[in-house]
Regions:
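Rossmann-fold dehydrogenase core element
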Residues: 64-82, 102-106
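Beta-loop-alpha module in the N-terminal Rossmann-like domain of NAD(P)-dependent dehydrogenases
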Residues: 9-68
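N-terminal Rossmann-like dinucleotide-binding module
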Residues: 1-6
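Short strand-turn motif at the edge of the Rossmann-like AdoMet-binding core
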Residues: 53-54, 79-82, 110
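Contiguous beta-strand/loop segments that form the cofactor/metal-binding neighborhood of enzyme cores
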Residues: 137-221
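Predominantly a Rossmann-like dinucleotide-binding segment in NAD(P)-dependent oxidoreductases
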Residues: 84-158, 164-167
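C-terminal glycine/acidic-rich active-site capping loop/insertion
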Residues: 81, 201-244
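Hydrophobic residues in well-ordered beta-strands that form the structural core
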Residues: 51-52, 76-78, 213
Length: 244
């Protein structure tokens, strides 16, 4: 059978048929190669669409797709999860309102457990040319929320460690030093680990204090804690795991 109905959910094995139905919003969670095809197919239907990053396997192709989406006035959004996270938005307000003064510097350390890489499985997720790898899957999240919090950045220098398997040259560790026009210096480290929960920590040093936003969890986005260190006071806020 081509489709199975469970209450109000219809599972369709031909994605093109979905566009012919009375659906207002399409949400994609597919590999970049297929995602590019689906987004282009939607040019004729112009349905609102939410997609993952990277948009396609190549940066130039992704740029062209974004340009066409704007020209065709198709409502679209890339799923940059952290920009909609309750505590990331709380942190942005604290920075904008200068509750602890001006930001002096910050660091990001994100260690994660890559299942495909650790098991030496050759998939698009371990192949940077197919839109996978640390740079495309993880580092893009970090750069996007750093721009959201601190403004546009430029990379000063980077350090990369590689691991080779099944003909792939996999970046298992990336460290980047960044700076922005306001002279806010940042150090970003993203790397694969073999065991344990993923560990994601953002540390920010201000003129009048220090803030740490962190989680140690199986889930990328859940159980974050915001700790605000001001003069003689520490305030702790736990995430409600809510998104805009």
């Amino acid at each position: 059978k081509n489709k199975f109905q469970i209450r109000n959910i219809i599972l369709e094995n031909n994605w093109k048929k979905v566009f012919k139905k009375k659906i207002n919003l399409i949400i994609l969670a597919v590999p970049p190669k297929l995602q590019e095809k689906i987004i282009k197919y939607n040019f004729r239907y112009k349905k609102k669409i939410i997609f993952e990053k990277p948009i396609s396997q190549q940066y130039t192709k992704s740029e062209k797709i974004v340009k066409l989406l704007k020209e065709k006035k198709i409502k679209s959004e890339i799923n940059l999860t952290y920009l909609n996270h309750d505590l990331f938005n709380k942190l942005k307000l604290l920075i904008l309102r200068k509750k602890l003064g001006r930001v002096k510097r910050y660091s990001v350390v994100w260690s994660f457990k890559g299942i495909d890489f650790n098991n030496r499985i050759k998939t698009w997720k371990t192949d940077e040319k197919q839109g996978g790898g640390i740079k495309n899957i993880f580092l893009t999240h970090v750069f996007s929320y750093c721009e959201f919090l601190f403004g546009s950045n430029r990379i000063i220098k980077s350090k990369i460690k590689y691991s080779k398997f099944k003909g792939l040259k996999y970046k298992k560790f990336i460290s980047s030093d960044v700076n922005n026009p306001d002279n806010i210096y940042g150090k970003i480290s993203v790397f694969n680990k073999k065991t344990g929960f993923q560990n994601h920590k953002i540390s920010i040093w201000f003129e009048k204090g220090y803030i740490k936003l962190f989680t140690k969890s199986k889930d990328w986005t859940k159980d974050f804690i915001l700790k605000i260190h001001s003069k003689n006071k520490i305030t702790t806020i736990k995430s409600k795991n809510k998104f805009k």
